[in-house]
């Protein structure tokens, strides 16, 4: 009799085809190992007894031996997954990523399709912070799609660990604080977090920041770690003025210098400001009293603070 040592990822069918050259060899394994059943999960290091020189297909056995192949297909979940909640977010990852994770807190329920052969993961949200990580169990040819199904409201949502190349928010979601660091993608769907008041996008690389204009409840925004092109940052800053719409005042942190000089812009014949640069937009935001009544606008640019003060000489 021979002894076969199990390696990680092997199931009973792998052992049968490796030893006998056909899955029908399972019968001999069950006869020689009284403790064994078809429902058993084999573990690395387990040993099974088999009949020496009993081979159903010698060519298959010889092929594995010649090429040094040990079959280890594991147990795969190949059946359809059923989800009970609305599909809210889809993320796409490069197929070179071997794992992903994120943190979340809030109240409600979350169901995750990790885009591999694993079963759906269900996470109840009870108000405590939850950190979840996942190791993908199979490769994909193109981009890997991860789908998040959920209901409820979120206090904090950090997607940094996904390293997404694409982000699609398909339904409005109640989120208070959102974080996504060091991503290279479009943020066109962020307005689907209409109530968010704290956003950290440090290290974000994107061509357009104007989708952030839709976040009128925003009170804190961090865009550190990236030097944006002046037209990109200017378009956002100018939009904060031209599309103010009674939005909340906000603290915005940047590591890039907007165009122009921090000064009062020229006015047209109707007495309206004609904003010619990003710094002029900041001047208007930090000097318009009606826009600073509740809390002041504040801009931190490379450590220099521009902020509304009742004493106009202290506005820088």
Name each model feature, range by range:
Residues 224-227, 253-259:
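Short, loop-centered acidic/histidine patches that primarily coordinate divalent metals
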Residues 228-237, 265-267, 271-273:
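Leucine-rich repeat
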Residues 1-111, 118-203, 207-224, 235, ...:
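Cell-surface/extracellular proteins and modules involved
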Residues 255-277:
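Short, flexible/disordered intra-domain loops and linkers
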Residues 290:
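A SAM-dependent methyltransferase catalytic signature shared across enzymes that methylate proteins
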Residues 227, 242-243:
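C-terminal low-complexity, glycine/proline- and small-hydrophobic-enriched intrinsically disordered tails
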